[in-house]
């Protein structure tokens, strides 16, 4: 799914509003995912998955940093996320459906924190962006 110029602008503007809250929002999205989709916990058997866990916060920050990097390279997501794609496909062997689940909980988190900025157009653009990120992260599973 190709991001239009409007999509790219919406994604950059929305992520700009996230700003320094990105690590906290990443952790919150992970917590939402673990609560809403308990099977996702199986990929984190060594984590303390309780609310406010330092491990969840640290992984949320990794997720947020990867997305921030992706937002800065919207025209080269495959090149930008290649290492993460290798990691998730070959070492971690994460079921591809989990990227969709995290994308969903991230959208919910952003909508909750940025209600006036989370217009239908921004929602659609962020959804397309996260779908593209998910596609790239699962591209090396074949």
Swiss-Prot record:
GO terms for biological process: hydrogen peroxide catabolic process. Keywords: Acetylation, Heme, Iron, Metal-binding, Oxygen transport, Phosphoprotein, Transport. Red blood cells. The modification Phosphothreonine is found at residues 109, 135, 138. InterPro entries: Globin (IPR000971), Globin-like_sf (IPR009050), Globin/Proto (IPR012292), Hemoglobin_a-typ (IPR002338), Hemoglobin_oxygen_transport (IPR050056), Hemoglobin_pi (IPR002339). Residues 2-142 form the Globin domain. SUPFAM superfamilies: Globin-like. O2 binds at residue 59. The keyword Transcription does not apply. The modification Phosphoserine is found at residues 4, 36, 50, 103, 125, 139. It holds the Pfam family Globin. Heme b binds at residue 88. One of its GO terms (molecular function) is oxygen carrier activity. Gene3D superfamilies: Globins. The modification N6-succinyllysine is found at residues 8, 12, 17, 41. The modification Phosphotyrosine is found at residue 25. PROSITE patterns: GLOBIN. Involved in oxygen transport from the lung to the various peripheral tissues. Heterotetramer of two alpha chains and two beta chains. Belongs to the globin family. This is Hemoglobin subunit alpha. It comes from Alces alces alces (European moose).
